[in-house]
Amino acid sequence: MSALRLIVGLGNPGPEHAQTRHNAGFRFVDALAERTGARWGLDSKLFGETAKAEIAGHTVWLLKPATFMNLSGKSITAALRFWKIEPEQLLVAHDELDLAPGTARLKFDGGHGGQNGLRDTIRLLGHGKFHRLRVGIGHPGHKDRVVPWVLGRAGRDDDMAIGEAVDAAIDALPLALDGNFNEAMKRLHTPKK
């Protein structure tokens, strides 16, 4: 499996969205940039903010699309073209309703599962053959409550759990960057004793 070269966090831009559950992907790449000392800069040709990070001996591009969640594919595909990166070398971090807060899961390939940022990316790529980091935000219990749930802020306990999941995913990332995606999955998916 190809080593990762681009890590994208999905979210909505602007301070009013900064702490929402839907911005779990932004939270991941922001934490990654902070841990590595990478600095964000606006890149209008890529429709987002970019940073260059050094992680475990690998140079990786970070991207936060500024297009709003539903149009994330525009920024992602522009970055893939500009940096000549294959979709298989892409990791997209996003919020996941079907996972409890405190849970993060890596996967490769698949559908969008109702996540509109993934939906747009898959539509523009023509396939779903890229890596994903699913950051659990929990489900409100009924589909009619999903929109206010994802656009709302998590309570203190859930917010702490999401932060722990982000940290665990960052800790597993060097394995994925080395091309050992299955080992990274095993590390992240195995409960700590």
Swiss-Prot record:
UniProt xrefs under InterPro entries: Pept_tRNA_hydro (IPR001328), Pept_tRNA_hydro_CS (IPR018171), Pept_tRNA_hydro_sf (IPR036416)
Top-rank taxon: Bacteria
Site (Discriminates between blocked and unblocked aminoacyl-tRNA) residue list: 12
Location(s), subcellular: Cytoplasm
GO cellular component, one term: cytoplasm
Site (Stabilizes the basic form of H active site to accept a proton): 95
GO biological process: protein quality control for misfolded or incompletely synthesized proteins; rescue of stalled ribosome
Pfam family, one: Pept_tRNA_hydro
UniProtKB keywords: Cytoplasm, Hydrolase, RNA-binding, tRNA-binding
Gene Ontology MF annotations: peptidyl-tRNA hydrolase activity; tRNA binding
Catalysed conversion reaction: an N-acyl-L-alpha-aminoacyl-tRNA + H2O = an N-acyl-L-amino acid + a tRNA + H(+)
Enzyme active site: 22 (proton acceptor)
List of residues binding tRNA: 17, 68, 70, 116
EC number: 3.1.1.29
Main localization (coarse): cytoplasm
HAMAP family per record: Pept_tRNA_hydro_bact (MF_00083)
PANTHER family for this protein: PEPTIDYL-TRNA HYDROLASE (PTHR17224:SF1)
Complexes and interactors: Monomer.
Assigned protein family: Belongs to the PTH family.
Purpose of the protein: Hydrolyzes ribosome-free peptidyl-tRNAs (with 1 or more amino acids incorporated), which drop off the ribosome during protein synthesis, or as a result of ribosome stalling.
Protein name (Swiss-Prot/TrEMBL): Peptidyl-tRNA hydrolase
Species for this entry: Xanthomonas campestris pv. campestris (strain ATCC 33913 / DSM 3586 / NCPPB 528 / LMG 568 / P 25)
